[in-house]
Amino acid sequence: MAKGSKGYIVGVMGPVVDVKFPEEELPDIFNALEVVNPQTGQKIVLEVEQLIGDGVVRTVAMDSTDGLMKGLEVVDTGEPITAPVGKEVLGRILNVIGEPVDEAGEIKSKERWPIHRPAPELIEQSTEIEILETGIKVIDLLAPFPKGGKIGFFGGAGVGKTVLVMELIRNIAIEHKGFSVFAGVGERTREGNELWLEMQESGVLGNTVLVFGQMNEPPGARFRVALTALTIAEYFRDVEGRDVLLFIDNIFRFVQAGSEVSALLGRMPSAVGYQPTLATDMGELQERITSTRRGSITSVQAIYVPADDITDPAPATTFAHLDATVVLSRRIAELGLYPAVDPLDSSSKILDPAVVGREHYEVARGVQEVLQRYKDLQDIIAILGVEELSPEDKLVVHRARRIQRFLSQPFHVAERFTGRPGKYVPLEETIRGFKEILDGKLDDVPEQAFLMAGTIDEVKERAKEMRS
């Protein structure tokens, strides 16, 4: 298809715009078209979704269509929407079409990549299953992240999701020399602004790219912004050979945006009014997130569950792609235990002795067993008190309370608020610490010594100070 072909608008239906071209100059599916809004003088990008006959193509706008009218000239760029890639985009905020929105000047990147790209061929993909060490005890022990895997974050407002995300970004940047890409998909602009300011203050912005298509933007932008972020991450993986963390907040909004444009494109809705192409849309995004021989993209996706119904098609389709789930619990946050990760609800497919090793597996299962037994005893304790328990059950409660507190840990990005220096805990230290608690070697150590500690050696030091 020749670049520069010209057509004109023949219909505008909200974010969907119909454009007529000469029959011999029809643009390809997913090509980006450009039209100038006569009211604002701004260039609006339209993405071709369907060829509907008689030279007419149906497109979805990446910006508001207010001011567009029939007869306006439209130019075919001859290529899909492209995103700037490379180190020049680090520390910047972009929109869906790769334009900077942080008022920090133009992005002078040497390359731009199309946002529609095939997933890596099977022969290019890495078949080794490897743990991505995060330095966060509760995650590394109970819900280990596979390198190149997909992790779902579940949690309501105010349970520490953003702080956990920022700590992951910091640890990947400093401990793994990796980069992070954050895709804000259909979330609040205020939250995006707060994240940007917090990243500046905590010093992680320089290793991160932020790509936003927020709640106030048209569905086309919200639907495609995750692909823009993923393309930037793919460059760091494939060209720079890095381990990249890709955060998508929120994957449900990606589905929701697709559902909004689907009916306008004339598609028959499927279950619960979602688009009939739901599984395909999700698959095209998720299959590109993987490890190759050069590097990896590990994706952490916040998942909003509508009306707490996990059978809803949007979250249900997402679950099929996940390798691990991290559930943040308000009950744990209220106890003042951070990160507020629920150790019983969180899980990982790679928590298997064949992958993580026999010792890691047995310690993790031992921790969950003690915590589950403690949870089962809660009702009895509430009615009768701890004194009425059998000696074995008292020992379970005794160790469970120490495990609960040892699962907490101070974060580097929260140092300014807590006054406690952050701790990165290597996986071997995490396993050793919990093994000693399970073996009863620390039964005489006071509970307070375990709270907000890093390694088990730090707990022992604190216990010595308390006794002296």
UniProtKB/Swiss-Prot annotation:
Q: Where in the cell is it found?
A: Cell inner membrane
Principal location: membrane
Assigned EC number: 7.1.2.2
Superkingdom of source:
Bacteria
Tell me which InterPro entries the record gives.
AAA+_ATPase, ATP-synt_VA_C, ATP_synth_F1_bsu, ATPase_a/bsu_AS, ATPase_alpha/beta_chains, ATPase_F1/V1/A1_a/bsu_N, ATPase_F1/V1/A1_a/bsu_N_sf, ATPase_F1/V1/A1_a/bsu_nucl-bd
Q: What does the record give as the reaction this protein catalyses? A: ATP + H2O + 4 H(+)(in) = ADP + phosphate + 5 H(+)(out)
- Record's subunit section: F-type ATPases have 2 components, CF(1) - the catalytic core - and CF(0) - the membrane proton channel. CF(1) has five subunits: alpha(3), beta(3), gamma(1), delta(1), epsilon(1). CF(0) has three main subunits: a(1), b(2) and c(9-12). The alpha and beta chains form an alternating ring which encloses part of the gamma chain. CF(1) is attached to CF(0) by a central stalk formed by the gamma and epsilon chains, while a peripheral stalk is formed by the delta and b chains.
Tell me which family the UniProt entry assigns to this protein: Belongs to the ATPase alpha/beta chains family.
> What name is this protein filed under?
ATP synthase subunit beta
